[in-house]
C-alpha cells in the first residue's frame, strides 16, 4: 500500500507512483 498525494511519508511508507517524499508526498516537477 502506498501513500497518496500530500499524505505523510517516511522510509516505511512510500509514496504512490513516482511522487517524492518530502515529509509528505509531492508530485515530481
UniProtKB/Swiss-Prot annotation:
Function according to Swiss-Prot or TrEMBL: Spider venom neurotoxin that blocks voltage-gated sodium channel Nav1.3/SCN3A in human (IC(50)=1 uM) and rat (IC(50)=1 uM). Partially inhibits human Kv11.1/KCNH2/ERG (40% at 10 uM).
Subcellular localization: Secreted
Protein name: Beta/kappa-theraphotoxin-Pmu2a
Tissue: Expressed by the venom gland.
The entry's keywords: Amidation, Disulfide bond, Ion channel impairing toxin, Knottin, Neurotoxin, Potassium channel impairing toxin, Secreted, Toxin, Voltage-gated potassium channel impairing toxin, Voltage-gated sodium channel impairing toxin
Single GO term (MF): potassium channel regulator activity
Domain notes: The presence of a 'disulfide through disulfide knot' structurally defines this protein as a knottin.
Species, as recorded: Pterinochilus murinus
More about this protein: Negative results: has no effect on human and rat Nav1.8/SCN10A.
Presence of keyword Cytoplasm: no
Cysteine disulfide links: 2-16, 9-21, 15-25
In-chain residues carrying the UniProt-annotated modification Leucine amide: 29
Family (UniProt): Belongs to the neurotoxin 30 (phrixotoxin) family.
Keyword hit for Secreted: yes
GO cellular component: extracellular region
Amino acid at each position: 500500500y502506498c501513500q497518496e498525494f500530500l499524505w505523510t511519508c517516511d522510509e516505511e511508507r512510500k509514496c504512490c507512483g513516482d511522487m517524492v517524499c518530502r515529509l509528505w508526498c509531492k508530485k515530481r516537477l
